[in-house]
Amino acid sequence: MVQTKKFRGVRQRHWGSWVAEIRHPLLKRRIWLGTFETAEEAARAYDEAAVLMSGRNAKTNFPLNNNNTGETSEGKTDISASSTMSSSTSSSSLSSILSAKLRKCCKSPSPSLTCLRLDTASSHIGVWQKRAGSKSDSSWVMTVELGPASSSQETTSKASQDAILAPTTEVEIGGSREEVLDEEEKVALQMIEELLNTN
């Protein structure tokens, strides 16, 4: 009942079994990884899920290169070699189960961080998106080219700014997410317009 080791993403139930769960960084939700006999098994499940979600730079309980050799984070080796052999043979099945759980949790379009960003190098302002996962990438969803600042542009009305912004936007629209992006596009243009009006 007394917990001797503390692993990330692992806790012990009152009746002695160990459970693992991981928090998705972008969805702000907990993903249930399962119930395990030992804390080490639960910690390894957490490690695999963390690597699947965040790539090789994920915070794990065990070193990534020694993940299946039986070494713990303190450098001590496990007593039972048979448990490490069974964990290495079942790691591929565990990995597929964890991938399925992560896909089930993320049924919505791929999780991402979206923000308004100013690119001073190329004089653009726009909506920038960073995707989560091991194959994470970042890209501009929509950009608006900023022209040279002049006193006549500062006094333009809101209607003329709409006319300026409309033809210069570049939008990447993916298949079935058109309606969602249309709403996001409206919000992004409104945010860009408000930023341009405040300057």
UniProtKB/Swiss-Prot annotation:
Source organism per UniProt: Arabidopsis thaliana
Function summary: Promotes cuticle formation by inducing the expression of enzymes involved in wax biosynthesis. Confers drought resistance. Acts as a transcriptional activator. Binds to the GCC-box pathogenesis-related promoter element. May be involved in the regulation of gene expression by stress factors and by components of stress signal transduction pathways.
Family: Belongs to the AP2/ERF transcription factor family. ERF subfamily.
Chain intervals with Low complexity compositional bias: 79-91
GO molecular function: DNA-binding transcription factor activity; sequence-specific DNA binding
Annotated PROSITE patterns: AP2_ERF (PS51032)
Protein name: Ethylene-responsive transcription factor WIN1
Expression sites (tissue/organ): Expressed in aerial organs, mostly in flowers, and in roots. Also observed at the branch points of pedicels of most young flowers, and in a patchy pattern in roots of mature plants and very young leaves in the rosette, including support cells of their trichomes.
DNA-binding positions: 6-63
Localization (cell): Nucleus
